[in-house]
Amino acid sequence: MASHNSSDSTLDDTIMDGPAKLCGPKIFCIGAGKTGTTSLESLFKSLGFHVGDQERGELLLKEWATRNFAPIVSLGASAQFFQDMPFNCPFTFQAMDMAFPNSKFILSVRDDGEQWFGSLIRFHTKLIGKGRLPTAEDLRVFPYRYAGWILEALKLVYGVTDEEPYRKETLITAYERHNDEVKRYFRYRSESLLVINISDKGAAERIIEFVGLDYHDELMPHLNRSDDNV
């Protein structure tokens, strides 16, 4: 069992003190997919936070692309914790910061862009390509939110093309640019942003302290941090 005073626990063995009060600040996880957003969602659910409707958010991709933030702000008013698209897309964090003052932002990251790219490729190869790198046609017919949604997301958010939907340089550049823009935006407000690699020892303690919660020696449910599920 982990101890609050230890710096060795990760999101797998965090301890907590019951559910969080739902009257605190909103929390937006603005890291790219495959950086631990699923684990963070599980963490905040286990802490008692009201987690936003991910499907509803992902269906606002086209609104994000036209910078129509009104429906995204409306979704932001509906819960306390949010992750994945459109909240982790460029420009959304600024809109949420203005719409919901005193919110907390968590930028989840991997060790570097190469590691993030590898995780994305492995996940899509397993999920969509059934053992091979998906083609644009595979992405057009894959029924996630609707057929073609994943290809649209890759093109709109990361700037890839139909000809090269997994162009390494384009994807890594977009990933790193977003991270840099987030850190630059919050550079004078360290109380508002936590940059975290969830595989680091002590990550769970840092996250819980960042959102202002206390916890004691009660083991929290296991969180899956395998490479294919972050």
Q: What residue spans do the PLM features occupy?
A:
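The identity of the second residue at the extreme N-terminus of proteins
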Residues: A2-S3, V230
